[in-house]
Regions:
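Short, well-ordered beta-strand elements
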Residues: 22-32, 52-57, 80-81, 128, ...
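Extracytoplasmic "Venus flytrap"
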Residues: 24-41, 59-61, 135, 385-391
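Extracytoplasmic "Venus flytrap"/periplasmic binding protein-like
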Residues: 40-116, 120-122, 148-150, 157, ...
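Conserved C-terminal helix/tail region of periplasmic/extracytoplasmic solute-binding proteins
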Residues: 53, 147, 371-435
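Hinge/lid segment of periplasmic solute-binding proteins
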Residues: 85-136, 160-161, 178, 190-193, ...
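Extracytoplasmic/periplasmic solute-binding protein
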Residues: 124-132, 137, 161-212, 219, ...
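Glycine-centered hinge/linker elements that transmit conformational signals in sensory
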Residues: 165-168, 209-240, 281-286
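C-terminal lobe and pocket-closing loops
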Residues: 263-276, 288-397, 435
Length: 435
């Protein structure tokens, strides 16, 4: 009797031990298609790691950034794996809020990751996030509509040429809009696109003494061009459209042209989700007076907050989701063209290049993007479509709201730029610039 009770107790404790050993990781990510695919394929990870369970929190881009910023700044500890970009990796890594991505397995082959991507996610040589995909920006256009109109897209178009094409191809009565661009307010939404437009017109966020330049001729020309072109030749409600909204519009055949992230290449050519999959052309992002900073550099990456109590398990998952093995899994289940792009040299095999008609332009754009030299003028900051200082998140969000207001006609462009100049100057002084 005593022996049976003892065995029963031992069995219960063993069962309890197994239950306790299973760790649940809370993964916060953005509602982009590549991440939705990662969530779906993560069942493979859980099968290989029965001691790790995944709890997914999938959010719209602006909401994700707000949630993660609040949680990590307060050391809230809600999440074990964060989907962040180069901006957060640099700043949060420097503050000691992220666990270093050291001691990765040899099979991870970190040397295979593009140096510019590694550097963008590192601080003083220490890597703080593993890149899931990396992107630049490029131009997508409807080859059939260009042919019908007798137009030819140059390999390196100017924004002025883009506006001319948009005017000729804009047929709102047929729900065919000349150009689709980001209008949704957010430092990583409309301001990513707007800043590359401004760079192309020769503008910069700050001069060498950290003084904003929004009322200067370059920003004035760029802002007027952006608001005028998108208001005249864009879809209705453009101020509500970010990356995902414009992707849906393009895939439904409603955009003659679209300038946005290179990562969209696999989606616009996917017949299962794009009505125009066989009618898409690809070329470089537009320039104007300069090509410096005309195409951005960005990476969505997986990081681990120091507040996580399950760092080892979190690193195991992050390494799996950003590995060559994961890329091979995607190629097997969804086709080689859908492999997360922009992070690894090995991705760009002959097979991938043949299957992905957008890959050549995307790869060249990634390699040419230089965050250390984003403007024709000298700048005190690093970043093409953003400024890598802690204050930029708040400033960029506020500026984005004002650009969206100008786009909806709530205020003239000059008035908007004056307001932006004043608010940005005030915030920079409050933060103690110049430093």
């Amino acid at each position: 009797m005593k022996i049976s009770h003892l065995l029963l107790g031992t069995a219960c404790m063993a069962s309890l031990g197994v239950t306790q050993a299973a760790e649940t990781l809370t993964v916060a990510t953005v509602n982009n298609a590549d991440m939705i695919r990662m969530q779906r394929l993560s069942k493979t990870f859980e099968e290989k790691h029965p001691d790790i369970k995944l709890n997914w929190v999938v959010l719209e881009e602006n909401v994700l950034r707000q949630r993660l910023t609040t949680d990590i700044a307060t050391q809230g500890g809600q999440f074990d794996v964060l989907t962040i970009g180069m901006y957060e990796a640099s700043l949060w890594g420097a503050k000691g809020w992220l666990a270093p991505m050291t001691d990765l397995p040899a099979s991870y082959n970190l040397d295979d990751v593009f140096p510019s991507v590694r550097e963008g996610l590192s601080v003083d040589g220490t890597l703080y996030a593993l890149p899931f995909y990396a992107e630049s920006s490029m131009t997508y256009y409807r080859t059939d509509l260009f042919e019908q109109a007798g137009l030819e897209m140059p390999e390196h178009p100017t924004w002025t040429q883009m506006a001319d094409f948009a005017e000729k191809l804009h047929k709102p009565g047929d729900e065919q809009y000349g150009i689709c661009l980001r209008g949704k307010a957010g430092w990583g939404e409309n301001m990513a696109l707007v800043t590359t437009v401004a760079n192309a017109f020769g503008a910069r966020w700050f001069d060498e003494k950290w003084q904003p330049e929004f009322t200067g001729p370059e920003w004035t020309q760029a802002a007027k061009f952006y608001v005028d072109t998108l208001s005249k030749y864009g879809p209705p409600g453009a101020s509500s459209n970010g990356f995902n909204e414009n992707l849906a519009l393009f895939n439904s055949g409603k955009c003659a042209m679209w300038v946005d992230a290179t990562v969209a290449g696999s989606f616009v050519t996917d017949e299962s989700q794009s009505k125009v999959a066989d009618k898409v052309g690809f070329t470089f992002a537009p320039h104007e007076t300069t090509d410096k900073g005309s195409a951005w550099l960005y990476s969505w990456a997986l990081a681990i907050p120091t507040s996580s109590q399950q760092k080892d398990a979190a690193k195991t998952f992050a390494a799996w989701a950003t590995s060559k093995d994961y890329a091979e899994l995607v190629a097997k289940t969804d086709g080689v063209a859908n492999v997360p792009p922009g992070t690894r040299e090995s991705t760009y095999s002959e097979e991938y290049m043949a299957a992905a008609p957008f890959a050549k332009i995307a790869l060249e754009s990634l390699k040419q993007a230089d965050p250390a030299s984003p403007s024709a003028k000298p700048v005190p900051y690093v970043g093409i479509q953003l400024v890598t200082i802690p204050e930029f998140q708040a400033i960029g969000t506020q500026v984005g709201k004002m650009f969206a207001a100008a786009l909806t006609g709530q205020m003239p462009v000059e008035q908007m730029l004056t307001a932006v100049q004043q608010s940005t100057t005030r915030e920079m002084k409050r933060a103690g610039y110049p430093k």
